[in-house]
Regions:
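Phosphate- and other anionic-substrate recognition elements at nucleic-acid/protein interfaces
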Residues: 1-4, 8-222
Length: 222
């Protein structure tokens, strides 16, 4: 199976693909410029709720306890895509869903809208930090934006013979963007589980679930 992992970046999007065991990469300003694999994991909310928190966000945070839960933010309501400004969207979310809209989620709305506009069968939301936790047996011990955090993530990627794309100097793509895209691509090659397990969809038919690799136990090797 040919697979792709996609992460958002200042340049737009960074994609790492694996086909017949060979890695390749693409940096594009728009998702429609990326030739995606049959299975594509993307680090971005896809399905959005109308008036409540997404169950998938809660379940992903559970995977990162005790110290890395802040890596998963609450996705915005679908109606946030229609709001003219942050304050209006934030007030609407508080009134109709009981929680505010983070600035992080607000600034990602154009990316979320792009995912929903260009969505293809085989695309599914995933989360690189949770993929890391499942492939190592524990959440990362350090932030991916620290020297120590980069090192522990690279150590995992090297177990899968991943090329050192994070050493490339591509404008608008940070080291952690490369690492996240690589983690997602590798995760997509492995047997998948879905959270929530019943694979719900939102009112517009987009998936309200994430794909993750099956947990590797201490007796398994790569």
């Amino acid at each position: 199976m040919d697979v792709t992992g996609i992460d958002a970046a200042k340049a737009g999007w960074v994609a790492v693909s694996i086909k017949d065991g060979q890695f390749s990469w693409t940096v594009a300003s728009s998702l429609d410029e990326i030739e995606c694999g049959t299975r594509t994991y993307i680090d971005m909310p896809v399905g959005l709720e109308e008036n409540k928190r997404r169950s998938v966000d809660r379940l992903l945070r559970e995977e990162l306890k005790p110290g890395r839960t802040s890596c998963v933010f609450n996705a915005p309501l679908r109606t946030a895509l229609e709001q003219p400004d942050y304050h209006t969207a934030n007030d609407y979310s508080k009134q109709h869903a009981g929680f505010g809209l983070s600035k992080q989620a607000w600034y990602l709305l154009p990316k979320i809208e792009q995912v929903r506009t260009h969505y293809q069968p085989g695309w599914v939301e995933s989360h690189p930090e949770v993929c890391f936790a499942r492939l190592t047996g524990h959440p990362a011990r350090h932030s991916k934006r620290t020297v120590e955090g980069v090192a522990e993530r690279i150590a995992l990627l090297q177990r899968y013979a991943c090329p050192a794309y994070w050493e490339l100097n591509v404008r608008g793509v940070a080291t952690d963007d490369w690492i996240d895209a690589c983690l997602l691509a590798i995760a997509a090659t492995l047997p998948a589980v879905y959270v929530p397990a019943d694979c719900p969809v939102d009112i517009t038919g987009f998936p309200l679930y994430a794909a993750l690799p099956k947990k590797i136990t201490f007796t398994e090797t790569v």
